[in-house]
Every structure is written in structure tokens, then in C-alpha cells.
Amino acid sequence: MTGSIAELIPAQERAIRLSPRDPQVGLFYFRIGFGHLLQSRTDAAIVWCEKARNATPAHPLFRTLLASAYALKGDSASAAAELAEARRLVGDDRYSSITRLRAVVSWGAPKDLVEATYFAGLRRAGVPETDAAAAGVGGGAGPTERQGAGNA
């Protein structure tokens, strides 16, 4: 994502208006939800992240953003369910720790906001800061390529 957070949401809303049946509409919803989460508007983030999940149910990153928002709202059961489904869908260990997730996802948003919202929510959802593989214990080489938010 590029540009300011203030520009993000209107740009995505415009894209949805121009192309409501776009095959990437789930990504537009995700970006709106992410923008709301970064601004600590958790209720709005949940609405848009649920739309993203419903539009693209097999996208694990959409589910982790929703898990984070649910956890920040205090809905630990929904957060745990979304996190478990994201882990099942992704097929690797990127959601095993905050450290591992940082290694594979590039957000293009201010790091302090991502820390205060997305990662804080994932911590509340039960994602540990590190794990044995992420810390280099047990021979895990770790991820080698970074993926953008649309591909994680």
C-alpha cells in the first residue's frame, strides 16, 4: 500500500464503486479494513475484514487481520477461530510467531501503527512473539522471500 492512510479508504471505496464485481474486490475490502484497523477503528475494521474474508475465504492474510481485530475487540473465540483457519490455509509456519510473520510480510504502512494494532491484536489472539523455529532453534532456516500484503 502506498500513500497516506487518509487516502487509502476513499481510493478503495472508489475502486469498489467503479468495479463492484472485480475479482479482486476482497483485496479492496481488506485494504479498507486494514486502514480502519490502523486508525484504531476496530468495529469498522471488523465489518470490512469480514467482507474481505467472505469475498475471498481462502486468503489467510485476510483472516489474520480479522483475527487481530476480533482480539482487539475482546472476542477471543472468533479471533482464535480465524487464526486457526489462516494457519490451516497458509500451509507454512508464518503465523507461528510475530517474529516469523514480520520476516515474510511487508506492509507498506507505518511500522508503529502496524505494531500497535495488527501485531497487538495477534498477540491477544495468542500468537507468541517468537517460537523455537523463528528463534533459530531446531534447525529452521526460516523464510527467505518477502511477500506483499496481497500475497501473504
Task: Give each language-model segment a name.
Residues 1-152:
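Alpha-helical protein-protein interaction modules
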